[in-house]
Amino acid sequence: KTLAVSVRAKEFVSYHCSCCGHCCRHIENCVMVESLDAYRMAKHLRNQHCGISSTDDVLLRYCEPMPLTDEGYPIYVLKTVGADATCIFLRENQCSIYAARPRTCRLYPFSVGPGERGRDFEYCLCFDDNQQHHFNSGKVLVKDWLYHNFPKEDKEFLKQQYLVIPEIGRLMHRMPEEMRQAAVFKILFYHYYHFELDQPFLPQYDQNNRSLLNELRKLAPSE
């Protein structure tokens, strides 16, 4: 179980990474792989000559699909291996894709959510079963951690995501149940598969969202 406590950017928190790999274990269905994550992972692994040439390859080899909502909104999570549900990318207690690790991993032990009262984002410190390993020494200034691990591209991606996800949810809720499987396939296509690795991510994501909403509106009856 994870306890999330709201923090401000100017706060100091006790945290120290000892490179023990504990936060990479017991993570089954825990680490979401978002569109931007899959794109970065694919580019990184392609450059490492790992037999990866597209986001499709990454998602098939390293991720599992799962529904996030009752309507079946699809997401991907990292695959795990072994009895202790270890991240598929953990090698000798080190992340083998560290430079392209998912945002969830880069921000740990913090998380980001939609902001309130005029703020773009809210930040939380996440306490979990690894508390004994990470939260007993060291000091981290929240804004410094975010500066290094939450770049502008991530912020712009999340702003777009926060705008489009509620609309997708409303459209899926209005759809006849027999249309939802078709909607799931369209979401997977436009949010995960329809990307060129040699083109910038954000313009593609923006266009994909426009195309996706147009397709979903055809499946949902007018109000």
Predicted regions and their residues:
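Short loop/turn segments that flank or connect secondary-structure elements
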Residues: 1-223
